[in-house]
Protein backbone atom coordinates (compact mmCIF):
# COMPACT_ATOMS: atom_id res chain seq x y z
CA UNK A 1 0.00 0.00 0.00
CA UNK A 2 1.20 3.49 -0.84
CA UNK A 3 1.48 6.07 1.87
CA UNK A 4 -0.73 9.19 1.85
CA UNK A 5 2.10 11.76 1.40
CA UNK A 6 3.43 9.87 -1.61
CA UNK A 7 -0.04 9.76 -3.20
CA UNK A 8 -0.55 13.44 -2.49
CA UNK A 9 2.81 14.35 -4.08
CA UNK A 10 2.15 12.27 -7.21
CA UNK A 11 -1.31 13.86 -7.68
CA UNK A 12 0.16 17.34 -7.25
CA UNK A 13 2.98 16.53 -9.68
CA UNK A 14 0.53 15.19 -12.29
CA UNK A 15 -1.65 18.29 -11.88
CA UNK A 16 1.35 20.62 -12.32
CA UNK A 17 2.48 18.78 -15.45
CA UNK A 18 -1.03 18.94 -16.93
CA UNK A 19 -1.37 22.64 -16.17
CA UNK A 20 2.09 23.37 -17.51
CA UNK A 21 1.36 21.57 -20.81
CA UNK A 22 -1.98 23.34 -21.20
CA UNK A 23 -0.39 26.70 -20.48
CA UNK A 24 2.33 25.99 -23.00
CA UNK A 25 -0.19 25.29 -25.77
CA UNK A 26 -2.18 28.45 -25.07
CA UNK A 27 0.98 30.51 -24.85
CA UNK A 28 2.28 29.05 -28.10
CA UNK A 29 -0.85 30.12 -29.98
CA UNK A 30 -0.66 33.62 -28.51
CA UNK A 31 3.09 34.02 -29.00
CA UNK A 32 3.26 33.00 -32.66
CA UNK A 33 2.06 36.33 -34.11
CA UNK A 34 4.15 38.29 -31.63
CA UNK A 35 7.27 36.20 -32.26
CA UNK A 36 7.25 37.08 -35.96
CA UNK A 37 7.62 40.78 -35.14
CA UNK A 38 10.25 40.07 -32.47
CA UNK A 39 12.21 37.89 -34.90
CA UNK A 40 12.87 40.93 -37.06
CA UNK A 41 14.12 42.92 -34.08
CA UNK A 42 12.04 46.08 -34.58
CA UNK A 43 8.43 47.13 -34.64
CA UNK A 44 7.18 47.49 -38.19
CA UNK A 45 5.44 50.79 -38.70
CA UNK A 46 2.91 51.62 -41.36
CA UNK A 47 4.58 53.66 -44.06
CA UNK A 48 3.06 55.10 -47.19
CA UNK A 49 6.51 55.92 -48.55
CA UNK A 50 10.13 56.26 -47.50
CA UNK A 51 11.62 59.76 -47.25
CA UNK A 52 15.02 60.63 -48.71
CA UNK A 53 15.73 62.99 -45.80
CA UNK A 54 14.49 62.96 -42.21
CA UNK A 55 14.90 66.74 -42.18
CA UNK A 56 11.98 67.08 -44.60
CA UNK A 57 9.24 67.24 -41.95
CA UNK A 58 6.43 67.50 -44.49
CA UNK A 59 7.61 64.26 -46.11
CA UNK A 60 7.96 62.49 -42.75
CA UNK A 61 4.44 63.53 -41.77
CA UNK A 62 3.02 62.40 -45.13
CA UNK A 63 4.85 59.08 -45.35
CA UNK A 64 4.74 57.74 -41.80
CA UNK A 65 1.15 56.99 -40.88
CA UNK A 66 1.53 56.16 -37.19
CA UNK A 67 3.86 58.81 -35.78
CA UNK A 68 2.89 61.19 -33.02
CA UNK A 69 3.61 64.87 -33.57
CA UNK A 70 4.38 66.91 -30.47
CA UNK A 71 4.05 70.67 -30.75
CA UNK A 72 6.89 72.57 -29.14
CA UNK A 73 7.34 76.37 -29.14
CA UNK A 74 10.23 76.30 -31.62
CA UNK A 75 9.40 73.38 -33.88
CA UNK A 76 7.23 70.35 -34.40
CA UNK A 77 9.10 67.19 -33.48
CA UNK A 78 8.13 63.67 -34.57
CA UNK A 79 8.24 60.85 -32.03
CA UNK A 80 7.92 57.12 -32.58
CA UNK A 81 9.90 56.91 -35.79
CA UNK A 82 12.02 53.96 -34.71
CA UNK A 83 15.49 53.51 -36.16
CA UNK A 84 17.79 56.41 -37.08
CA UNK A 85 17.95 57.29 -40.76
CA UNK A 86 20.26 55.36 -43.03
CA UNK A 87 22.66 57.15 -45.34
CA UNK A 88 21.34 57.56 -48.82
CA UNK A 89 22.79 58.94 -52.03
CA UNK A 90 22.53 62.71 -52.31
CA UNK A 91 21.61 62.63 -55.97
CA UNK A 92 18.12 61.26 -55.45
CA UNK A 93 15.74 62.85 -57.94
CA UNK A 94 12.70 62.27 -55.75
CA UNK A 95 12.04 63.38 -52.21
CA UNK A 96 10.61 59.96 -51.29
CA UNK A 97 9.98 56.44 -52.58
CA UNK A 98 6.38 55.16 -52.56
CA UNK A 99 5.59 51.75 -51.05
CA UNK A 100 2.84 51.14 -53.59
CA UNK A 101 3.14 52.06 -57.26
CA UNK A 102 -0.66 52.31 -57.43
CA UNK A 103 -0.88 55.28 -55.05
CA UNK A 104 -1.25 58.39 -57.25
CA UNK A 105 -1.29 60.83 -54.32
CA UNK A 106 2.02 59.45 -53.08
CA UNK A 107 3.56 59.57 -56.56
CA UNK A 108 2.51 63.21 -56.96
CA UNK A 109 3.80 64.13 -53.50
CA UNK A 110 7.17 62.42 -53.99
CA UNK A 111 7.82 64.19 -57.30
CA UNK A 112 7.26 67.65 -55.77
CA UNK A 113 10.22 69.62 -54.50
CA UNK A 114 10.21 70.14 -50.71
CA UNK A 115 9.65 73.67 -49.40
CA UNK A 116 12.73 73.51 -47.20
CA UNK A 117 14.98 73.08 -50.24
CA UNK A 118 13.15 75.69 -52.26
CA UNK A 119 13.65 78.37 -49.59
CA UNK A 120 10.80 80.44 -50.95
CA UNK A 121 7.58 79.98 -52.79
CA UNK A 122 8.15 78.81 -56.36
CA UNK A 123 7.56 81.56 -58.87
CA UNK A 124 4.23 81.36 -60.62
CA UNK A 125 2.44 83.67 -62.98
CA UNK A 126 1.78 87.02 -61.44
CA UNK A 127 -1.87 87.96 -60.84
CA UNK A 128 -1.57 90.55 -63.63
CA UNK A 129 -0.52 87.85 -66.12
CA UNK A 130 -3.45 85.65 -65.09
CA UNK A 131 -5.84 88.57 -65.44
CA UNK A 132 -4.53 89.41 -68.93
CA UNK A 133 -4.84 85.84 -70.22
CA UNK A 134 -8.31 85.53 -68.74
CA UNK A 135 -7.69 82.00 -67.46
CA UNK A 136 -8.70 81.92 -63.81
CA UNK A 137 -10.08 78.36 -63.64
CA UNK A 138 -7.81 75.76 -62.09
CA UNK A 139 -7.74 72.00 -61.97
CA UNK A 140 -7.80 70.19 -58.66
CA UNK A 141 -4.02 69.77 -58.62
CA UNK A 142 -3.39 73.43 -59.41
CA UNK A 143 -5.85 74.55 -56.76
CA UNK A 144 -4.20 72.33 -54.16
CA UNK A 145 -0.78 73.68 -55.15
CA UNK A 146 -2.05 77.27 -54.86
CA UNK A 147 -3.41 76.56 -51.39
CA UNK A 148 -0.04 75.11 -50.39
CA UNK A 149 1.68 78.22 -51.78
CA UNK A 150 -0.61 80.48 -49.74
CA UNK A 151 0.04 78.43 -46.61
CA UNK A 152 3.79 78.59 -47.14
CA UNK A 153 3.76 82.34 -47.71
CA UNK A 154 1.72 82.87 -44.54
CA UNK A 155 4.05 80.71 -42.46
CA UNK A 156 7.13 82.51 -43.84
CA UNK A 157 5.48 85.86 -43.08
CA UNK A 158 4.68 84.74 -39.52
CA UNK A 159 8.29 83.59 -38.97
CA UNK A 160 9.63 86.91 -40.21
CA UNK A 161 7.23 88.79 -37.95
CA UNK A 162 8.39 86.77 -34.93
CA UNK A 163 12.03 87.43 -35.80
CA UNK A 164 11.31 91.15 -36.13
CA UNK A 165 9.65 91.19 -32.70
CA UNK A 166 12.61 89.41 -31.08
CA UNK A 167 15.19 91.96 -32.25
CA UNK A 168 15.89 94.58 -29.58
CA UNK A 169 14.67 97.99 -30.60
CA UNK A 170 17.08 100.85 -30.23
CA UNK A 171 15.68 103.89 -28.49
CA UNK A 172 17.16 107.33 -28.64
CA UNK A 173 18.46 108.82 -25.45
CA UNK A 174 16.36 111.95 -26.11
CA UNK A 175 13.13 110.04 -25.49
CA UNK A 176 14.34 108.64 -22.18
CA UNK A 177 15.24 112.07 -20.76
CA UNK A 178 11.67 113.30 -20.65
Curated annotation (Swiss-Prot):
List the residue(s) that the UniProt entry marks as the site Cleavage: 69-70
> Chief localization class?
secreted
Signal sequence: where?
1-24
GO BP, sorted A to Z? angiogenesis; artery smooth muscle contraction; axon extension; cell surface receptor signaling pathway; cell tip growth; cytokine-mediated signaling pathway; endothelial cell migration; energy homeostasis
- The UniProt annotation puts the region (Disordered) at 159-178
Propeptide positions: 25-46, 70-178
* An annotated GO cellular component: extracellular region
Here the segments flagged for biased composition (Basic and acidic residues) are 160-170
Region described as Endothelin-like: spans on this chain: 96-111
SS bonds (residue pairs): 49-63, 51-59
Entry-linked PROSITE patterns: ENDOTHELIN
Alphabetically list the UniProt keywords.
Cleavage on pair of basic residues, Disulfide bond, Secreted, Signal, Vasoactive, Vasoconstrictor
Molecular function (GO) terms listed? endothelin B receptor binding; hormone activity
InterPro entries given in the database record: Endothelin, Endothelin_toxin_CS, Endothln-like_toxin
Compartment annotation = Secreted
Expression sites (tissue/organ): Expressed in lung, but not in placental stem villi vessels or cultured placental villi smooth muscle cells.
The protein's matches in Pfam families, at most eight in alphabetical order, are given as: Endothelin (PF00322)
- Write out the function statement from the record: Endothelins are endothelium-derived vasoconstrictor peptides.
Supply the PANTHER family for this chain. Answer: ENDOTHELIN, ENDOTHELIN-2
Family assignment from sequence similarity: Belongs to the endothelin/sarafotoxin family.
Protein name per the record: Endothelin-2
Q: Which organism is it from?
A: Homo sapiens
